[in-house]
Amino acid sequence: MRKFSLVAVTIGVLFALPAAAQVPPAPAAPDAPTRVRGTIEKFDGETLTVKSREGPQVTIGLAPNFTVVGVAKRSLGDIKAGDYVASISVKGTDGTLHALEIHIFPEEMRRTGEGQRPHDLIPNSLMTNATVSGITAAPQGHMLKVTDKGGEAEVIVGPDTPIVTYVPGDASLLKPGAAIFCIAQKKADGSLTAARITAEKDGVKPPM
């Protein structure tokens, strides 16, 4: 396993949500990215066995130079204008985005995945990677104004919205019972491989 490098990390974004909000992922084509969320059952140095969020056990082969990153809690007060963030959100009836979680990117990761796209955290969720242009009070918490190459968006962040950043980790985090998230590649034979694992650290679970 090579050492963690913030520059190398890419986020597919993103604490487990209530069971009612969980939906099975769409079948992935061979070599297509497959998001895996769950709890570690076993790690032997080369293979990770996970009880997935959807229920079935999943086995993930790890690349020889795989990396591990952890997450650390942050608060709304840690977000400032100019920060590059990822928000996973859903649209309210008024069309405004309501954040399910916010990730603060390290400066080295600015522009990672910039833009807005569908996400699979819950049905109809969106992921927006953008630069914070302003923060104002709102009836339901605070509103982040964010700007990306496609324009500007407003995201409501409630008082209970998980906010995290990424911190260095290593294989010692891959222990039974720890929560993980990864984006694995599905091979033609159905097996999964991954080069990066985001793992629970100091009790903070990946909110992806």
For the regions a language model picked out, list residue spans one by one.
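Repetitive helical segments and hydrophobic/amphipathic motifs
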Residues: 11-12, 133
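Short, flexible, surface-exposed loop segments at domain boundaries
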Residues: 2-6, 17-208
